[in-house]
């Protein structure tokens, strides 16, 4: 089983929890944000030394609250590549509509080559209107009043951008003429003629994987048809199992090949390990509650199960007890955490596991303790 670590990359908070301050009232300093950035790099080195397979960062912008302060994981990934030996470096996720697709392709190819083929192309459509609309696109967020129109526009832009990125990364010469992107634009003069095609420089020297989060029915159909890997997070196991199996069905329909039970699918789980379940719950509760105080209003808890057995209503702020009861978070002693991971392996055939061991507000010292304990006390159970 390949096991990676995923961090938001936020500032430390000594008042994390369900109470005040409200998420919208938080303001981190530039010094705090930069300290977090340096510690994110340090943590990558620790994870490399401990033998984790991969290390994933988020892309977010204008987050004065301090929850996610890394705007360009590829740029940071280049530094990580220089300081590590073997760990793969992924983005969860590059928000594709916020980039020009050719700049994203160039930057990823540069990281991939610099690292000797350790880059992972993680792509997404975004979740936060503050970021998307400021950077020239739209997103159908839960709190966006024109959600449907914005989502349709975003999806169309994402689809074309990914067409461009895949062409640029895999073909020596390419051109693309769609509704959103027209590349190269017609009529560009070049030494007596006009530009008819482009070549990405550099292009990847090594094979690479592409992964996208599975967050909606259209995405569940699109990702396997494209042949990419799907990332599953923050869903009740009933919903995860249904989508996990549907992913394999769509892949087989599109490509004529049956996937192995865990192939091309990654499970993400928030995790906390301690000597006892009670101690682990006490450790993780402030960060759990801060996380949902922050993300609940964006609709991130829609993967929880409501009392009617259907997805919970958007805007739910779950308690830690609900997260544990629904098996969406994995918290306990090393044996209990191992048992819960094995439960998912039995249910889904998981072969790619991404652990989220550091909650919003947690200290990096606590995060480092978690990755050490998981590597020493939990992961050897799956050797």
Model-derived segments and spans:
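Active-site mouth loops of central-metabolism enzymes
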Residues: 22-37, 94-102, 206-215, 271-272, ...
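An alpha-helical appendage that flanks or caps ligand/catalytic pockets
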Residues: 5-25, 142-200, 239-350
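N-terminal beta1-alpha1-beta2 module of alpha/beta enzyme domains
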Residues: 1-87, 208
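Hydrophobic faces of well-ordered beta-strands that scaffold small-molecule active sites
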Residues: 3-7, 55-57, 88-91, 119-123, ...
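A conserved active-site cap/scaffold subdomain adjacent to cofactor or substrate pockets
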Residues: 213-239, 243
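Glycine-rich, proline-tolerant flexible connector loops at the mouths of alpha/beta enzymes
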Residues: 54-74, 95, 234-235, 356-367
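Acidic (Asp/Glu)-rich catalytic clusters
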Residues: 48-49, 79-85, 112-118, 224-225, ...
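Conserved, mostly hydrophobic/aromatic
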Residues: 51, 59, 80, 111, ...
């Amino acid at each position: 089983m390949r096991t990676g670590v995923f961090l938001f990359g936020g500032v430390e908070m000594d008042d994390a929890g369900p109470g005040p301050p409200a998420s919208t009232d938080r303001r981190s300093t530039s010094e705090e944000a930069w300290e977090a950035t340096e510690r994110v790099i340090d943590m990558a080195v620790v994870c490399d030394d401990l033998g984790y397979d991969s290390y994933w960062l988020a892309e977010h912008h204008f987050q004065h609250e301090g929850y996610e302060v890394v705007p360009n994981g590829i740029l940071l990934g280049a530094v990580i590549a220089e300081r590590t030996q073997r760990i793969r470096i992924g983005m969860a996720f590059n928000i594709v509509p916020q980039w020009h697709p050719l700049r994203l392709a160039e930057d990823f190819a540069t990281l991939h080559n610099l690292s000797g083929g350790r880059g992972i192309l993680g792509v997404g459509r975004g979740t936060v209107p503050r970021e998307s609309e400021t950077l020239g696109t739209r997103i159908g967020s839960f709190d966006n009043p024109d959600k449907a129109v914005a989502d349709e526009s975003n999806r169309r832009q994402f689809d074309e951008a990914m067409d461009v990125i895949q062409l640029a990364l895999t073909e020596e010469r390419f051109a693309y003429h769609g509704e959103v992107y027209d590349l190269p634009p017609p009529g560009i003069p070049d030494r007596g003629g006009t530009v008819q095609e482009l070549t990405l420089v550099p292009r990847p020297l090594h094979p690479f994987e592409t992964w996208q989060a599975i967050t909606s029915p259209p995405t569940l159909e699109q990702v396997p048809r494209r042949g990419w890997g799907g990332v599953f997070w923050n869903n009740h196991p009933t919903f995860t199992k249904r989508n996990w199996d549907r992913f394999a069905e769509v892949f087989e329909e599109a490509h004529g090949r049956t996937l192995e039970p865990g192939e091309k699918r990654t499970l993400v789980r928030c995790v906390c390990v301690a000597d006892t379940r009670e101690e682990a719950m006490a450790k993780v509760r402030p960060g759990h509650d801060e996380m949902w105080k922050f993300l609940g209003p964006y609709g991130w808890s829609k993967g929880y199960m409501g009392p009617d057995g259907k997805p919970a209503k958007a805007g739910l702020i779950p308690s830690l007890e609900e997260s544990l009861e629904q098996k969406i978070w994995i918290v306990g002693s090393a044996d209990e955490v191992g048992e819960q991971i094995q439960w998912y392996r039995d249910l889904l055939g998981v072969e790619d596991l991404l652990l989220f061991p550091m909650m919003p507000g947690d200290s990096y010292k606590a995060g480092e303790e978690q990755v050490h304990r998981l590597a020493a006390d939990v992961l050897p159970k799956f050797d």
